Amino acid sequence: MKLDGVEIAIEKTNRRKTVSIFIERDGSVRVLAPVTATDDTIENAVRAKEYQIFAKLAKWKELNQGKVKRAFVNGQSFLYFGRNYRLSIEENQAVPLKLTGGYLRLDKKYLSKAEKVFKEFYREKAQQKIQERTKLIEDKFSTKPSSIKVLELRNRWASWTPKNRLTFHWKCAMAPVGVLDYIIMHEMVHLKYPSHSPAFWNELDKKMPDYRERENWLKQNGVKMAL
């Protein structure tokens, strides 16, 4: 459906009891609704939240004015677990990309496919760190994730499935560890509460009382977590 020219993606799922509206990381609007919800019910729910939708879209546009596009040249900075490291182009390096001596060092012969090399580097490092941090967090839960993967997700930092599989975006390797912990904790709470119900947020608040501060960092700086 469209709302004053804005395309809205609608997804029906048996995991929802009410209609929920989300502004995704790429600025798209997504509606999750129960499978029993009629088109009129969904449209009325969207219309009722029209002001909030456009207010959030305006905020998204404001934040995304700082969107970055990095060049693979000497001195360019790249985020790595919350810190900026400058790029150094090297010759005859044993591996395509490594972090050493305070620099991200890229072998010159991989310049033509630098973006692919960086994505794989971040994916591997995110996988390692997320496995490590999840082990520290999962003791607080009775249900454990059945698997953890790191991929390139379209418009989310992470996702879960009813089979308790967790998937994270490789860009999570750019976030500070404290913010990464929030992303993990958020998905872990979904293992108990599938939807963003009041019970979900209460549980998240109990498990991580300062989650709002970490979430806000992600909202304010997520646009900078890019190549």
Residue map of PLM features:
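Walker B beta-strand of ABC/ABC-like P-loop ATPase nucleotide-binding domains
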Residues: 184
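Active-site-proximal or metal-binding-adjacent scaffold patches in catalytic folds
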Residues: 1-181, 191-227
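Walker B catalytic acidic pair
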Residues: 187
